[in-house]
């Protein structure tokens, strides 16, 4: 079948509005344009964005001679409770907001213009623990075929063996006939189909797919007048007591959890934004991504295939116990099989997908019903695809706490809270803070008591009792925050494979060292790889000069949990994990904000450090500076302006901390091996006196219609950032469109759709969609600084 993108020609309005809708281009996040108010029912979950229902409209033109053709609409993601209407008739309903789904248009079309309406609900707040976005936030395609054709998702490709490399290609057709197939490096072949044709291909000297060598092959299948092109990788996944094997060799998964949003763009699933996110994560030492906590986009799979990043695709954040009042629980039982089927259909041909996860922190796994459901879902996935293992992210300590009544959702309590909130809204008052349940309860507890308490709590005997039966019903046991159980459980359960499905940043070194010794410890996913909208303040260490309150109230917009910040800048924690996971040996230097040494900040268990790679702290001369050096070495030395100011031996760690008086100039870290030979060196240089506004594009040329990321920085004349320079920047664009503007600050009262933003530690980010030619970005700051940058259009 042939696909036509339906990204333009749409309008969007609030459902029930009588005024014409505004023109929009898909993918589109309607929630990002809504106000953020203290009356938002989504509150801290959504970053205080208001929730509404939306109606999208466009026309589909079908010529008379095509009316008998097959027409199938594909929606890659509509949040949520999507209704699809064609010519006034309801053609489809799909409640889950994160799955792709298909609509057979045949019963509803007529020749000429057809009215297509899509309704997306999001007024039913709260319905998510994080910022979901709303509307048609992923692409839409119209699939068409005339006569006999290859069925949608009808080409399935699987590696059967590696020596020799044998690949199976299954092709489903709507009628008998001849199927023709070509694959790179092989002669063309054909086979008769009675509805399905099965090809077995032998590839001599096959180029294997791995994260280090992401080799891809192209497979072209033709049948009658139809043609399908698929890419695939020759790779095989195995799991057992030897651990997780990729192409027959043990492979340690070193991953990062990410949410689906793209920072300043909201939930918009733009291929350029997705490619950038994957690139940033891989550059910072991660070889895998966990799609938390919902099925990932097709764009993410394409990029992970291309760039070489493993994927754990995850289904959902809850099963039959609510975590928010209006989440997916009411639909789960009727829809989970179809949802999983569509997830596997999406993932099947992608070599990057190596794990399926049935859920996240589902305390149902502590109950008899949930234990049985764990097995049912695992078996169901095996029936769809037995080439990949199945896991589930279980919060070990929370399973125990929920079993004794802590943090459990109650419909009655939720109803009373909703009634109180509605009355407060009618009075124009802020509603009382909701009682946290489920994962939010655990997050709040961790924020109060710290990560060490939560990890120690997971070692209680009751935690084992309330997880062991569910773990027995999955291929790999997913431990959220259970690192202190690893050694004990590997010994107690000699057949169990363990995955750190969600972990604290400061455990990266411990994990890596233990995983090298224990094959059945297969991997780790840190929370979180990149910051995300919603679930505000959960991972933030923020100071009073940037955050008005430490209670997560209005103004807070992001979690602050990323090792990479909301604008895509790697922080000190990213440098630490690069070294801890042995992506390289360092050394790297990061410095805690010297102007805030000793100051109180917002609490979080998910923050290991707020250090950043800067030695430009104007006005802080003589003040104590907390310096961190990350290195795989026997010893590190700290040198300031040519004088050694500290030396530390590294034992069972890759982090050395120093406290020294701040003095501008050159700060160097030197690493040494056990024989005291220098093996690495890095330095930070203080910025000079004069300040200017500097604009830097991440790419020198960008294709028309694609995204250009432009960093706005206060710098000296040499381009060194000044983190203590602070101001407001106004941005104009000629020859393109400003689609996102903001800073990484988790507390931000501006809209990312504004043309003005405050800086955060001297920086902000503008995202520009290129027009047909060159694009000029003009920035001005507080009437004092100005700069412009022209980005050339790529031919």
Language-model segment annotations:
Residues 3-17, 30, 46, 51-151, ...:
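Accessory beta-strand-rich segments of carbohydrate-active enzymes
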Residues 35-62, 66-75, 79-86, 92-95, ...:
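Active-site-adjacent substrate/metal-binding segments within catalytic domains
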Residues 164-191, 197-199, 625-644, 666-671, ...:
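Beta-strand-rich binding/interaction modules
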């Amino acid at each position: 079948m042939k696909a036509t993108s339906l990204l333009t020609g749409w309008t969007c309005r609030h459902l029930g509005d009588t005024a014409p809708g505004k023109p929009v281009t898909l993918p589109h996040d309607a929630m990002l344009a809504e106000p953020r108010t203290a009356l938002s029912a989504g509150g801290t979950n959504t970053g205080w964005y208001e929730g509404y229902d939306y109606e999208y409209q466009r026309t589909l033109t079908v010529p008379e001679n095509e009316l008998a053709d097959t027409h199938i609409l594909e929606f890659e993601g509509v949040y949520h409770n999507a209704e699809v209407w064609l010519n006034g008739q309801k053609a489809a309903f799909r409640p889950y907001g994160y799955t792709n789904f298909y609509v057979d248009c045949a019963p509803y079309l007529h020749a000429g213009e057809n009215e297509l309406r899509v309704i997306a609900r999001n007024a039913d707040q709260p319905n998510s623990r994080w910022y979901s976005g709303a509307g048609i936030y992923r692409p839409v395609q119209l699939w068409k075929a005339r006569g006999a054709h290859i069925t949608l998702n009808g080409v399935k490709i699987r590696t059967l063996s590696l020596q020799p490399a044998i690949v199976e290609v299954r092709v489903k057709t709507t009628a008998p006939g001849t199927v023709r197939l070509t694959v790179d490096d092989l002669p063309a072949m054909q086979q008769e189909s009675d509805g399905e044709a099965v090809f077995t291909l032998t590839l001599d000297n096959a180029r294997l797919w791995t994260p280090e060598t992401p080799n891809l092959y192209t497979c072209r299948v033709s049948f009658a007048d139809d043609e399908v092109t698929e890419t695939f990788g020759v790779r095989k996944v195995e799991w057992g007591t030897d651990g997780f094997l990729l192409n027959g060799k043990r492979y340690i998964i070193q991953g990062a959890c990410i949410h689906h949003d793209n920072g300043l763009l909201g939930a918009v699933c733009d291929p350029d934004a997705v490619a950038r996110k994957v690139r940033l994560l891989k550059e910072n030492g991660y070889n895998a991504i966990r799609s938390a906590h919902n099925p990932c986009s097709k764009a993410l799979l394409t990029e992970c295939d291309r760039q070489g990043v493993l994927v754990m695709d995850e289904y959902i954040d809850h099963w039959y116990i609510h975590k928010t009042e209006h989440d997916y629980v009411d639909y789960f039982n009727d829809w989970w099989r179809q949802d999983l089927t569509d997830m596997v259909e999406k993932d099947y041909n992608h070599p990057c997908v190596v794990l399926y996860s049935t859920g996240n922190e589902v305390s149902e796994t502590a109950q008899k019903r949930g234990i049985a459901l764990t097995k049912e879902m695992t078996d169901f996935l095996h029936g769809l695809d037995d080439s990949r293992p199945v896991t589930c992210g279980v919060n070990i300590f929370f399973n125990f706490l929920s079993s004794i009544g802590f943090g459990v959702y109650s419909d009655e309590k939720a109803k009373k809270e909703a009634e109180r909130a509605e009355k407060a809204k009618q009075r124009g008052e802020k509603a009382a803070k909701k009682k946290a349940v489920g994962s939010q309860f655990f997050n709040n507890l961790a924020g109060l008591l710290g990560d060490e308490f939560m990890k120690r709590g997971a070692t209680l005997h009751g935690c084992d009792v309330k997880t062991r039966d569910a773990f027995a019903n999955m291929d790999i046991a997913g431990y959220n925050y259970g690192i202190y159980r690893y050694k004990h459980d590997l010994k107690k359960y000699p057949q169990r494979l363990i995955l750190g499905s969600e972990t604290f940043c400061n455990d990266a070194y411990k994990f890596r060292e233990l995983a090298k010794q224990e094959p059945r410890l297969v991997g780790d996913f840190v929370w979180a790889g990149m910051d995300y909208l919603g679930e505000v303040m959960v991972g933030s260490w923020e100071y009073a000069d940037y955050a008005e309150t430490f209670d997560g109230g209005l103004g807070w917009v992001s979690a602050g949990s990323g090792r990479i910040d909301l604008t895509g800048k790697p922080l000190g924690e990213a440098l630490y994990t690069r070294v801890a996971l042995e992506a390289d040996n360092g050394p790297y230097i990061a410095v805690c904000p010297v102007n805030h040494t000793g100051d109180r900040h917002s609490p979080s268990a998910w923050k290991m450090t707020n250090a950043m790679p800067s030695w430009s702290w104007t006005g802080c001369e003589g003040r104590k500076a907390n310096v961190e050096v990350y290195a795989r070495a026997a010893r590190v030395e700290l040198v300031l302006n040519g004088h050694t100011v500290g030396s530390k031996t590294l034992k069972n760690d890759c982090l050395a901390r120093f406290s020294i008086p701040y003095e501008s100039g050159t700060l160097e870290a030197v690493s040494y091996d056990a024989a005291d030979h220098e093996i690495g060196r890095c330095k930070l240089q203080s910025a000079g006196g004069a300040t200017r506004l500097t604009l830097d594009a991440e790419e020198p040329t960008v294709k028309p219609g694609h995204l250009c990321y432009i960093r706005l920085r206060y710098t000296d004349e040499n381009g060194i950032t000044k983190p203590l320079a602070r101001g407001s920047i106004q941005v104009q664009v000629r020859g393109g469109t400003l689609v996102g503007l903001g800073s990484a600050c988790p507390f931000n009262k501006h809209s990312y759709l504004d043309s003005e933003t405050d800086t955060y530690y001297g920086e902000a980010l503008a995202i520009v969609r290129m027009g047909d030619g060159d694009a000029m970005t003009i920035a001005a700051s507080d009437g004092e600084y100005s700069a412009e940058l022209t980005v050339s259009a790529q031919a």
